[in-house]
């Protein structure tokens, strides 16, 4: 999509958002690639290089040492990442009263780092770990330090149980999905950013908005199966598209005052 098409799509999206009553953002891995975090299913995606089974609860239970060897490198990448313009734009749209919730599939904590307040994390957050035995929670940096000191798997200082990341692994339920779907059913606009809408049940969230008579905006570099279902589609980078949308929203709001 060229700059002209992105600009036109950004304007249309801004009009929809400024006229909304309760808009939500739904974000996937594509919003964080510009922060240096690889996505999962793209050409350089994580699951093209590694077996997804390495991120399963079964693997953690059967080989916690191997699990941590795989995850520690990914967590180091997350720990070094910083919010990009797309995260910052969503946070500003929330401050302007446009976006009511950010519902994310990501575990990278970048929405909170950018200043978003109402964030629902469907798949958890990498910044904490907890003991599989006593459930005591600790900062991820404690597990990282223990691992770097040669303790693999890292263990709970309190009871000696194995520590695990506070994220949803393959084979585990998505506990926050019901809350997200309830919010979606009350919303009139879903702004999808950086998601191919192929991972369920998470992908149901923006679709519920549309099914309840709301509007659907999709910002994703690659086409999705729901592009024809959407009201506006922008095949642009997340930061470029959201920068356009934010500026257009500000212009519309200024003109209305």
Swiss-Prot record:
Per the UniProt entry, the signal peptide is none
The catalytic activity of this protein is classed by the Enzyme Commission as 2.3.1.286
Q: Which organism is it from?
A: Caldivirga maquilingensis (strain ATCC 700844 / DSM 13496 / JCM 10307 / IC-167)
Q: What cofactor does this one take?
A: Zn(2+)
Chain's role: NAD-dependent protein deacetylase which modulates the activities of several enzymes which are inactive in their acetylated form. Deacetylates the N-terminal lysine residue of Alba, the major archaeal chromatin protein and that, in turn, increases Alba's DNA binding affinity, thereby repressing transcription.
* UniProt keyword annotations, A-Z: Cytoplasm, Metal-binding, NAD, Transcription, Transcription regulation, Transferase, Zinc
| Catalytic activity, reaction form | N(6)-acetyl-L-lysyl-[protein] + NAD(+) + H2O = 2''-O-acetyl-ADP-D-ribose + nicotinamide + L-lysyl-[protein]
Q: Binding residues for Zn(2+), per the UniProt record? A: 131, 134, 156, 159
- The name of this protein is NAD-dependent protein deacetylase
Quick one: which gene encodes this?
Answer: cobB
């Amino acid at each position: 999509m060229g700059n002209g098409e992105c600009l036109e799509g950004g304007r249309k999206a801004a009009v929809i958002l400024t006229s909304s009553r309760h808009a939500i953002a739904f974000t996937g891995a594509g919003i964080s690639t510009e922060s240096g975090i690889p996505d999962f299913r793209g050409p350089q995606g994580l699951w093209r290089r590694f077996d997804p089974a390495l991120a399963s609860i079964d693997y953690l239970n059967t080989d916690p040492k191997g699990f941590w060897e795989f995850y520690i490198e990914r967590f180091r990448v997350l720990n070094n990442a910083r919010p990009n313009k797309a995260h910052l734009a969503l946070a500003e749209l929330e401050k302007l009263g446009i976006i009511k919730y950010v519902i994310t599939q990501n575990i990278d904590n970048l929405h909170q780092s950018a200043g978003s307040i109402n964030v629902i994390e469907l798949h958890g957050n990498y910044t904490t770990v907890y003991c599989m035995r006593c459930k005591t929670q600790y900062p991820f940096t404690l597990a990282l330090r223990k691992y770097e000191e040669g303790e693999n798997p890292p263990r709970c200082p309190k009871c000696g149980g194995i520590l695990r990341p506070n994220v949803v692994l393959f084979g585990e339920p998505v506990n926050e999905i019901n809350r997200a779907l309830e919010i979606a059913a009350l919303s009139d606009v879903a702004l999808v950013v950086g998601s191919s809408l192929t991972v369920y049940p998470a992908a149901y969230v923006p679709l519920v908005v549309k099914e309840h008579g709301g509007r659907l905006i999709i910002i994703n570099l690659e086409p999705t199966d729901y592009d024809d279902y959407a009201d506006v589609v922008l095949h642009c980078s997340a930061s470029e598209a959201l920068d356009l949308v934010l500026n257009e929203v500000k212009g519309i709001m200024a003109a209305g005052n």
